[in-house]
């Protein structure tokens, strides 16, 4: 048993940040809370930590209700985005702080504290930095020290609020890979907030996608990305092209293309939207009858391994994006201004509307 929240409600004035939300975090898993700004992810994390009080609902740790306990008594380690290290203390003193401020009857001996701190420094691969000050460390190193300090008190759960948000892209990628390896080593039940879709999909065992204080989908990275529950999840998790059309009798007409949509076989004459990832937009030199849409190449941009191509549909004038790998692009020898034809490798059709 890990963390369970039941029917949580949290309001700030007239704004409902958490709206009757329930969630299970299994023991030993690393779970990401992901969503747009204002979706409630940080508020949910702070309620779990005891830094915010819910207006309604329960927070349960390993089968025991902890809603009335303050943050200090919940046994959680919390890592903030901006490190929150004590500048006047050495790295050793920062990590030891949570142990040294315990009341005397619960405080470990100095030798035990020293061994614990040095063990954690080794765990975060900074054992030679124990006598330095935070100002002498890089941002990535400071965040690893903040994590070591959170682990020093031997928490039952680890909570992280956008732990890599203040770091540059390269360091952020290195640290999230490191966090995944660390979690696999210590297996502490962990929940982290992120606004970075790639980060959530790379690091976590499960992703919780929130919108307007409610959960839209919970699943493994593969489940939420490749089998999105609704149009909001599909649109939120990466770039997408939208194709408007109508559903009738198990088929959807999207401009000049008709696609089979048996999942909507009972719907008659309803507006629909087809969702296609850029890498599922295939570019052809010659048309294929009833399967392609003519388009003009507007812009070509290489990102190194891949090439992004903006195209304008000749039937509607709308702009869409295709993504090719470099070898595909070279074989087609495309140039701006050329007319080509596009078709979809994969498309998902939704009938309901979405908003972000």
Swiss-Prot record:
Q: Where in the cell is it found?
A: Cell inner membrane
- Its principal location? membrane
Biological process GO terms, please?
sulfate transmembrane transport
Q: What is its EC number?
A: 7.3.2.3
One Pfam match, given by its short name, reads: ABC_tran
The membrane topology noted for this protein in its Swiss-Prot or TrEMBL record is:
Peripheral membrane protein
Q: Which GO terms describe its molecular function?
A: ABC-type sulfate transporter activity; ABC-type thiosulfate transporter activity; ATP binding; ATP hydrolysis activity
Record-level GO cellular component terms: ATP-binding cassette (ABC) transporter complex
- Annotated ABC transporter domain residues: 3-237
Keywords in alphabetical order, please: ATP-binding, Cell inner membrane, Cell membrane, Membrane, Nucleotide-binding, Sulfate transport, Translocase, Transport
- Family label: Belongs to the ABC transporter superfamily. Sulfate/tungstate importer (TC 3.A.1.6) family.
Q: How is the subunit organization of this protein annotated in UniProt?
A: The complex is composed of two ATP-binding proteins (CysA), two transmembrane proteins (CysT and CysW) and a solute-binding protein (CysP).
Q: What does this protein do?
A: Part of the ABC transporter complex CysAWTP involved in sulfate/thiosulfate import. Responsible for energy coupling to the transport system.
Q: What is this protein called?
A: Sulfate/thiosulfate import ATP-binding protein CysA
Organism of provenance: Leptospira interrogans serogroup Icterohaemorrhagiae serovar Lai (strain 56601)
- Name the gene that codes for it: cysA
């Amino acid at each position: 048993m890990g963390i369970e929240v039941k029917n949580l409600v949290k309001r700030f004035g007239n704004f409902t940040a958490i709206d009757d939300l329930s969630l299970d975090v299994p023991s030993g898993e690393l779970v990401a809370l992901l969503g747009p700004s204002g979706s409630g992810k940080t508020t949910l994390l702070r309620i779990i930590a005891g830094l915010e009080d819910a207006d309604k609902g329960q927070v349960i740790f390993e089968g025991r209700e902890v809603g009335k306990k303050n943050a200090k008594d919940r046994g959680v380690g919390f890592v903030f985005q901006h490190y929150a290290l004590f500048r006047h203390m050495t790295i050793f003193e920062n990590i030891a702080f949570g142990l040294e401020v315990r009341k005397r009857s619960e405080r470990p001996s100095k030798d035990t504290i020293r061994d614990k701190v040095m063990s954690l420094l080794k765990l975060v691969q900074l054992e030679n930095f124990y006598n330095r000050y935070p100002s002498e460390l890089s941002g990535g190193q400071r965040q690893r020290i903040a994590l070591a300090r959170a682990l020093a008190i031997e928490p039952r759960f680890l909570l992280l609020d956008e732990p890599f948000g203040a770091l540059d892209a390269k360091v952020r990628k290195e640290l999230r890979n490191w966090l995944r390896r660390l979690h696999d080593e210590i297996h502490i039940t962990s929940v982290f907030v992120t606004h970075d879709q790639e980060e959530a999909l790379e690091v976590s065992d499960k992703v919780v996608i929130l919108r307007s204080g409610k959960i839209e989908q919970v699943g493994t990275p593969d489940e939420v990305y490749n089998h999105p529950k609704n149009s909001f999840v599909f649109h939120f998790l990466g770039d997408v092209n939208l194709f408007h059309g109508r559903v009738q009798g198990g088929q959807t007409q999207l401009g000049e293309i008709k696609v089979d949509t048996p999942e909507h076989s009972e719907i008659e004459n309803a507006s629909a939207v087809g969702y296609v990832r850029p890498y599922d937009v295939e570019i052809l030199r010659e048309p294929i009858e009833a399967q392609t849409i003519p388009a003009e190449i507007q812009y070509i941009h290489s990102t190194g391994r891949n090439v992004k191509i903006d195209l304008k549909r000749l039937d509607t004038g709308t702009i869409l994006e295709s993504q090719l790998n470099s070898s595909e692009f070279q074989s087609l020898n495309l140039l701006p201004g050329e007319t080509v034809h596009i078709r979809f490798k994969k498309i998902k059709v939704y009938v309901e509307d979405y908003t972000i």
